[in-house]
């Protein structure tokens, strides 16, 4: 039996492309608890900013905190990414617990908690003393070929991605709080997987909906193999009992349904999807490159966020949004942040779910 056939059979067993209709969660609706806060839509398609909200005082410690956090999660899932400024009184513990509660209050699996990154955790010298907080630093060099790595980053090569797609149960919500900013540059961009799906014709959508992809975190394994005395892979459960070992490989649908909104999103974007299992190697490469180029070439499905002050913070939904850092700050200082990543459900496609545009027309 060919390798392709074997992978396809595995995908049919593993990926819940079609399950009983009553097993699918119903989309969630906000209560309106956040409506009292001033906000700005960053673009028509993606992004929202609450310029005056203090997360600790106004949300975490509010009498109706659960209601507010649930509505915040729904808003993040609908808008893709949500921003807050200068959260100077937010601790790492509050930061990560807020990310976890976003998922809990929107019905993520009970055994899904917070992700422990395979490399960026407290077992390595660049981590903090907390496995559930990853330090994102411009000083971290995974690979020995610094000239090539720097050139790739300058060109923006392979930079759009969704967090930890290589896990059996990948991320739901991620939050990044920058603690140290360069003198200039270092913006982050997000792109809408909902809008990417919407921009294809119905025949293309149906084609994509029948596909699965193999996702791999092989880059982290290369880093470990290059410097085994320096990097170690965390092999214990990483936020879910199924996320174990050092294989860092999973099969997921190319199109998935976001359980919070009920909207379809392209999911196979970035460095982690390595192969579309039902296609030839050449066809797979062409499709993955085409999806990626759609993100790169359509600025109107993106939002760009300028980090203005330490402790600016972003929350996004990895199931339907992709992000990319801008590496344009060489010689302008260090860029450092603390990241917390929640673990969600195993990706699935509800064939009766709608696109974002279809759902908004019906609302």
Residues covered by each model-derived region:
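Fe(II)/2-oxoglutarate oxygenase catalytic core
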Residues: 2-78, 85-315, 319-363
């Amino acid at each position: 039996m060919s390798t392709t056939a074997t992978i396809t059979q595995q995908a049919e067993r593993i990926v819940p492309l079609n399950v009983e209709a009553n097993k699918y969660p119903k989309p969630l609706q906000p209560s309106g608890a956040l409506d009292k806060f001033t906000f700005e839509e960053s673009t028509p398609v993606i992004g929202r900013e609450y310029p005056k909200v203090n997360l600790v005082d106004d949300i975490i410690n509010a009498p109706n905190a659960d209601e507010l956090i649930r509505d915040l999660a729904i808003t993040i899932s609908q808008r893709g990414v949500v921003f807050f400024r200068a959260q100077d009184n937010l601790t790492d513990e509050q930061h990560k617990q807020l990310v976890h509660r976003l998922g809990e209050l929107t019905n993520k699996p009970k055994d899904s908690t917070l992700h422990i990154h395979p490399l960026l955790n407290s077992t390595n010298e660049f981590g903090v003393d907390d496995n559930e907080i990853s330090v994102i630093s411009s000083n971290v060099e995974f690979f020995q070929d610094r000239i090539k790595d720097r050139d790739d980053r300058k060109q923006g090569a392979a930079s759009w991605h969704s967090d930890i797609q290589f896990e059996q149960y990948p991320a739901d919500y991620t939050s990044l709080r920058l603690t140290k900013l360069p003198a200039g540059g270092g913006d982050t961009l997000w792109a809408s997987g909902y809008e990417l799906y919407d921009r294809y014709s119905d025949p293309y959508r149906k084609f994509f909906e029948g596909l699965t992809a193999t996702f791999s975190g092989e880059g982290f394994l290369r880093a470990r193999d290059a410097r085994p005395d320096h990097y170690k892979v965390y092999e214990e459960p990483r936020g879910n009992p199924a996320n174990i070992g050092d294989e860092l490989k999973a099969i997921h649908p190319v199109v998935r349904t976001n359980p919070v909104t009920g909207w379809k999103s392209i999911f196979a974007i970035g460095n982690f999807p390595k192969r579309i299992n039902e296609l030839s190697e050449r066809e797979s490469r062409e499709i993955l490159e085409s999806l990626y180029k759609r993100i790169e070439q359509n600025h109107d499905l993106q939002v760009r966020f300028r980090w203005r002050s330490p402790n600016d913070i972003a929350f996004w939904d990895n199931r339907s949004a992709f992000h990319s850092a801008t590496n344009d700050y060489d010689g302008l200082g260090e860029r450092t942040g603390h990241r917390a990543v929640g673990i969600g459900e195993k990706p699935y496609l509800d064939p009766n779910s709608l696109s974002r545009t279809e759902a908004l027309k019906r609302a």
